[in-house]
């Protein structure tokens, strides 16, 4: 052991002795340069992540494409074999191009199996919907045949739905046109609101898909409202994952007659900068009242993994005013529940705030699972509901029990008791006959 330690000390001393002349030589060379009047150029730190990626040659691109095609064929063969074996994998006809693009990004086989199972569930739901649709079509044909037969047998006028009636049938296309017309009117007179779609690079595939679904729900919730916003989707890139998913949800959004505002430009180029207010949960200033002259901006981002204050940084970089919803002032959050809200919940909150100006009404769109229930809520309603559910299962009537309990509670709290023992008039207290039963005997004899 001592021999190894001595060898280690000797080796370290030799290394130090070899390194010392190098440092001295570097010092002497720098001193000579200073005497000569020439300075050494300072080394600049280069961040490799800030440099653009080197351009690939055509041969490299073709090789990568060939490797990708080979890997895609292998994955398709894997999915086909698993489907033939009866596993939870959809058929190859169900797969779309964006499905295979996502499969190529999955690193492990277990991740591919989970994704295949998810697609298999979607395929089964679609097949079930098609079967139900076919059954409904057969039922409709049967009803039409019965109606025609009834008309042939009865020559008199038949009144009712499907027959002679004062009411006109309102088709789904009519409701659709009416709601689109309401959005067109909102583009002319309603306040504006912006959804910032510039966070695609900060989301993974799943988050981008969730963001696209929430953007679709924002459009639907805004269109169904009586007083909708003039909604603008800014910083949109049609080749991004979020916009491609949104196009699958709304296939007609690029039609010229469709009432949606898509802008590839930033909102600072479209609206006055002094009217813009960025709604971000990371700032310290609460939004007290709704101002119809302001244009509120919501960042279209789903941050399940990334919790960085990106919207705050962007608002500061653009020099915009910032505000956050007064959630802590009006709500008591439960333990372990995050304060994040979806995009459609934000739109619903702002719609109700614009209509009523009341935060209590607007914040009803916050999920109840995230907040603590109010203590002043009467517990009797919960007990009545739970006990009533149990009684209905047992086929019992318990309304009289709750009515008696309610009468007793009101009597003891607000008025004189109705069903409580009261002191009788004309009776004197006698200690010798108290609690002996003699007083009752005297009353009976009298």
UniProtKB/Swiss-Prot annotation:
<dbReference type="GO" id="GO:0030678">
    <property type="term" value="C:mitochondrial ribonuclease P complex"/>
</dbReference>
<feature type="modified residue" description="Phosphoserine">
    <location>
        <position position="57"/>
    </location>
</feature>
<dbReference type="InterPro" id="IPR038459">
    <property type="entry name" value="MT_TRM10-typ_sf"/>
</dbReference>
<dbReference type="GO" id="GO:0052905">
    <property type="term" value="F:tRNA (guanosine(9)-N1)-methyltransferase activity"/>
</dbReference>
<protein>
    <recommendedName>
        <fullName>Mitochondrial ribonuclease P protein 1 homolog</fullName>
        <ecNumber>2.1.1.-</ecNumber>
    </recommendedName>
</protein>
<dbReference type="GO" id="GO:0005739">
    <property type="term" value="C:mitochondrion"/>
</dbReference>
<dbReference type="GO" id="GO:0005654">
    <property type="term" value="C:nucleoplasm"/>
</dbReference>
<dbReference type="GO" id="GO:0032259">
    <property type="term" value="P:methylation"/>
</dbReference>
<comment type="similarity">
    <text>Belongs to the class IV-like SAM-binding methyltransferase superfamily. TRM10 family.</text>
</comment>
<feature type="transit peptide" description="Mitochondrion">
    <location>
        <begin position="1"/>
        <end position="24"/>
    </location>
</feature>
<feature type="modified residue" description="Phosphoserine">
    <location>
        <position position="62"/>
    </location>
</feature>
<dbReference type="GO" id="GO:0000049">
    <property type="term" value="F:tRNA binding"/>
</dbReference>
<dbReference type="InterPro" id="IPR028564">
    <property type="entry name" value="MT_TRM10-typ"/>
</dbReference>
<keyword id="KW-0809">Transit peptide</keyword>
<feature type="domain" description="SAM-dependent MTase TRM10-type">
    <location>
        <begin position="179"/>
        <end position="373"/>
    </location>
</feature>
<keyword id="KW-0496">Mitochondrion</keyword>
<dbReference type="InterPro" id="IPR025812">
    <property type="entry name" value="Trm10_C_MTase_dom"/>
</dbReference>
<keyword id="KW-0489">Methyltransferase</keyword>
<feature type="modified residue" description="Phosphoserine">
    <location>
        <position position="50"/>
    </location>
</feature>
<keyword id="KW-0808">Transferase</keyword>
<dbReference type="GO" id="GO:0005634">
    <property type="term" value="C:nucleus"/>
</dbReference>
<dbReference type="InterPro" id="IPR007356">
    <property type="entry name" value="tRNA_m1G_MeTrfase_euk"/>
</dbReference>
<keyword id="KW-0949">S-adenosyl-L-methionine</keyword>
<feature type="region of interest" description="Disordered">
    <location>
        <begin position="41"/>
        <end position="67"/>
    </location>
</feature>
<feature type="modified residue" description="Phosphothreonine">
    <location>
        <position position="60"/>
    </location>
</feature>
<dbReference type="InterPro" id="IPR016009">
    <property type="entry name" value="tRNA_MeTrfase_TRMD/TRM10"/>
</dbReference>
<keyword id="KW-0175">Coiled coil</keyword>
<dbReference type="GO" id="GO:0160106">
    <property type="term" value="F:tRNA (adenine(9)-N1)-methyltransferase activity"/>
</dbReference>
<dbReference type="Pfam" id="PF01746">
    <property type="entry name" value="tRNA_m1G_MT"/>
</dbReference>
<keyword id="KW-0597">Phosphoprotein</keyword>
<feature type="coiled-coil region">
    <location>
        <begin position="119"/>
        <end position="158"/>
    </location>
</feature>
<dbReference type="GO" id="GO:0090646">
    <property type="term" value="P:mitochondrial tRNA processing"/>
</dbReference>
<keyword id="KW-0819">tRNA processing</keyword>
<dbReference type="GO" id="GO:0070131">
    <property type="term" value="P:positive regulation of mitochondrial translation"/>
</dbReference>
<dbReference type="GO" id="GO:0097745">
    <property type="term" value="P:mitochondrial tRNA 5'-end processing"/>
</dbReference>
<comment type="subunit">
    <text>Component of mitochondrial ribonuclease P, a complex composed of rswl/MRPP1, scu/MRPP2 and mldr/MRPP3.</text>
</comment>
<comment type="function">
    <text>Mitochondrial tRNA N1-methyltransferase involved in mitochondrial tRNA maturation. Component of mitochondrial ribonuclease P, a complex composed of rswl/MRPP1, scu/MRPP2 and mldr/MRPP3., which cleaves tRNA molecules in their 5'-ends. Essential for the structural and functional integrity of mitochondria. Function is essential for pupal development.</text>
</comment>
